[in-house]
UniProtKB/Swiss-Prot annotation:
Disulfide bonds: none annotated. The modification FMN phosphoryl threonine is found at T187. This is Ion-translocating oxidoreductase complex subunit D. It comes from Escherichia coli O81 (strain ED1a). The chain crosses the membrane at residues 20-40, 42-62, 89-109, 123-143, 214-234, 242-262, 267-287, 301-321, 322-342. It is found in: Cell inner membrane. InterPro entries: NqrB/RnfD, RnfD_bac. It comes from the Bacteria. Its main location: membrane. Its EC number is 7.-.-.-. Pfam families: NQR2_RnfD_RnfE. It is a multi-pass membrane protein. Keywords: Cell inner membrane, Cell membrane, Electron transport, Flavoprotein, FMN, Membrane, Phosphoprotein, Translocase, Transmembrane, Transmembrane helix, Transport.
Length: 352
């Protein structure tokens, strides 16, 4: 009798890639709904543009590589890339920006490396960083949330602004953004960094309308809590593991608390860091990408903690208000090293 020795892994999860991607897409619904509520219909338009662009870009590359288009598109990874990029950019950003960022993410950051499972960097964050560096003004032109906004464009006006730059009544992004005590930076992190550099005290800054929320910035706290709810559902469904989100959030909270205690006049309080910007989106939907994150349990804890530290450092001392995208990519660079030194010992072999 001949026994065949199979290669590892000997146990595996029965879920297909398309199933896991679909679970992540479903978990994003609360976060998308919150962004629609607080920032208007532009978010939905950007998601549609990004989704179509991602599918077309992936289909084009697969066709050129003479691979099965239908079979690959069914894994839903292109849709997820487009979605993550779309919810990360301002809702009323010009249409060509989300198309450019999505095409770059799919073709350059994913397919150029060989496709799903081969890319070392998170494609959506690569697309986001390319847009942020190339078009910093447009990428920081967030509308104030509806709680403090003078006017949130309707569906037709959102389409008009995205495709032509003006509403049906002739208004543009500048007129839409201004009107809240003259503050044009419409995110809590933007406002805090700009105001501190202008010499304003933290007490003065916290009186701005953008900080009228119960816990953190107006609107943004609920958006982050919505992404947190989706992330908890992913944990419950066992689509992601707890190591990265927990270590990321604990490290970010710890660094923010220590920084705030030592320098309360220049550094933001921990609740601002935890419930503003892309904190919860990054913790549960971006850092947990199984392709670009660490693959060992100890490695995941280190990877998440490193990302949390980098987010706090970039937000506090860097040139950009929200450092999630840069932190993710910098942490991605360290994954091979982290995995090398956190490999579990093979049973029956000595360590080292």
């Amino acid at each position: 009798m001949v026994f065949r020795i199979a290669s590892s892994p000997y146990t595996h999860n029965q879920r297909q890639t398309s199933r896991i991607m679909l679970l992540v897409l479903l978990a994003a619904v609360p976060g998308i709904a919150a962004q629609l509520w607080f920032f208007g219909w532009g978010t939905l338009v950007q998601i549609l543009l990004a989704s179509v662009s991602a599918l077309l870009a992936e289909a084009l590359v697969l066709k050129l590589r003479k691979q099965s288009v239908a079979a690959t598109l069914k894994d839903n990874s292109a849709l997820l890339t487009g979605l993550l990029l779309a919810v990360s950019i301002p809702p009323l950003a010009p249409w060509w920006m989300v198309v450019l960022g999505t095409v770059f993410a799919v073709i350059i950051a994913k397919q150029l490396y060989g496709g799903l499972g081969q890319n070392p960097f998170n494609p959506a964050m690569i697309g986001y960083v390319v847009l942020l560096i190339s078009f910093p003004v447009q990428m920081t032109s967030w509308l104030p949330p509806h709680e403090i906004a003078v006017n949130i464009p309707g569906f037709i006006d959102a389409i008009q602004v995205i495709f032509s730059g003006h509403t049906t009544s002739g208004g543009d992004m500048n007129t839409l953004r201004l009107g809240i005590d003259g503050i044009s930076q419409a995110t809590p992190l933007d406002t805090f960094k700009t105001s501190v550099r202008a010499g304003h005290s933290v007490e003065e800054i916290m009186q701005y309308p953008i900080y009228s929320g119960i816990l953190a910035g107006a609107g943004w706290q609920w958006v982050n809590l919505a992404w947190l709810a989706g992330g908890v559902w992913l944990l419950w469904q066992k689509a992601i593991r707890w190591h990265i989100p927990l270590s990321f959030l604990v490290t970010l909270a710890l660094c923010a608390t220590l920084g705030w205690l030592f320098s309360p006049d220049t550094l933001a309080a921990p609740q601002i860091h935890l419930l503003s910007g892309a904190t919860m989106l990054g913790a549960f939907f971006i850092l947990t990408d199984p392709v670009t994150a660490s693959t060992t349990n100890r490695g995941r804890l280190i990877f998440g903690a490193l990302a949390g530290l980098l987010v706090w450092m970039i937000r506090s001392f860097g040139g950009y208000p929200d450092g999630v995208a840069f932190a993710v990519l910098l942490a991605n660079i360290t994954v091979p090293l982290i995995d090398y030194y956190t490999r579990p010992r093979v049973y029956g072999h000595r360590k080292g």
